[in-house]
Amino acid sequence: MQPFHTLSRILPFPDATQKAWWDKLAPMLLKAMQAQGYDTEAQYAQLGMVYKCVLPYLGQYPTVENDATRWKSFLCPYGIPIEPSLNISQGILRYAFEPIGPDVGTDKDPQNMNVIQDCLKGLTDHDDRIDTTLYAQFASRLLLTKEESQRVAATGQFTFKPGQGMHGYAVDMKGSQPMVKGYFCVGIKSAVTGIPTGKLMLDAVREVDTEGRITEPLDKLEDYYGNALGNLRLCFMSVDMIDPQDARTKLYGLQQEVSFEGLEDLWTLGGRINTPTNQEGLQLLRELWDLLQIPPGVRDIEVDHCSVGQPPKYLLPSLVNWTFLPGHSDPMPQVYLVPFGLPDAHISDALVTFFERRGWTDLARSYKSNLASYFPDVDFSQSRHVQEAISFSFRKGKPYLSVYMSLF
């Protein structure tokens, strides 16, 4: 814990809120980095970026007392504006966050748009390798324009509520060098323009892809989308903030009817992807589904946030993303099994069994103790909220899993 203690002594904190966020977030990230073998330089570099680029934009520190009034993020069931995750197959820690401004939810900033550019500038000033070319092109198409924002505010055409944010960032903590992604949630843009969310994003991707380098996989997704099982709704997208020639574009969807048949439909694009690799991955996905024992059923997509300090009050839909890269004729699926609301002890047992079957002996041995060290205040024999979702993909003959975690 030395980097945390050292930085806590020498860094100035402008207010008690940022210090509270630091005391909650930094130890968890540091313990996870140390468990994954990050060297000391990387630990300091990544915590320094959190301090400089993230803490100023996390808004109120969540408490039971302010839970009813604070701005709640779209990221997590509890409305927490930052969500850590761990790519356990590669040992890479990540976090996604929604920048929140000081005037959010007021007449000065009803749509939480005022700090987008400030936060982005902080990121690019911190790391000049961040390339905003594609991000800017999608932002101009998927965020509210100034005219739309003013019109909505003046006419009351749409009531903005917490959890209906439009943008966010994710940071892959790769050693001492982060890789940043930009996220666009288009539900508000859809409500304002009357254009369905899927069409908004598909049209934007086609417009930005001026050379048609991902037309073929995009056509396959668009053909599938109108015929998908389980009431699939495309709802947000992301783009890597790197050289556009190498950047991945991802489209995300929620599937209301949770079942393995629904996951199979997402994974194979309704039978449109039928490669040996895809089928091999499907077998392992089935194994993970059987181990987690997520109850099948129809889930609500639009739900109220859970209350801090209270256990989960619902189960959630399945989530999926498809990656689009030049040179790939098929969208590359990644599905998210969402056991949020099930006992964390059961989820951990299921994952450890999956690791053991893969021969990941060290991971199987250390997973539970590492997880407990990240959240020392949680009783994992009782909790049902920490391990929110498990993402699964399959590439080059290997499964890749990430665990998404709730800080509160």
From Swiss-Prot:
Any single Pfam family the record assigns to this protein: Trp_DMAT
GO molecular function, a single term: prenyltransferase activity
EC main group: transferase
Binding site for dimethylallyl diphosphate: 94, 181, 183, 248, 250, 252, 334, 336, 400, 404
InterPro entries associated with the record: Aro_prenylTrfase, Aro_prenylTrfase_DMATS, DMATS-type_fun
BP GO terms, sorted: alkaloid metabolic process
Highest taxon listed in the record's lineage: Eukaryota
Enzyme Commission identifier(s): 2.5.1.-
Keywords: Prenyltransferase, Transferase
Family membership noted in the UniProt record: Belongs to the tryptophan dimethylallyltransferase family.
Reported function: Prenyltransferase; part of the gene cluster that mediates the biosynthesis of echinulin family alkaloid. The pathway begins with the biosynthesis of the cyclic dipeptide cyclo-L-Trp-L-Ala (cyclo-TA) by the NRPS criC via condensation of L-alanine and L-tryptophan. The prenyltransferase criA then catalyzes the first prenylation step, a reverse prenylation reaction at C2, to yield preechinulin. Preechinulin is the substrate of the cytochrome P450 monooxygenase criE that catalyzes the formation of the double bond between C10 and C11 to produce neoechulin A.
Subunit structure as annotated in this protein's UniProt entry: Homodimer.
NCBIfam families: arom_pren_DMATS
Name by which UniProt lists this protein: Prenyltransferase criF
Gene behind this protein: criF
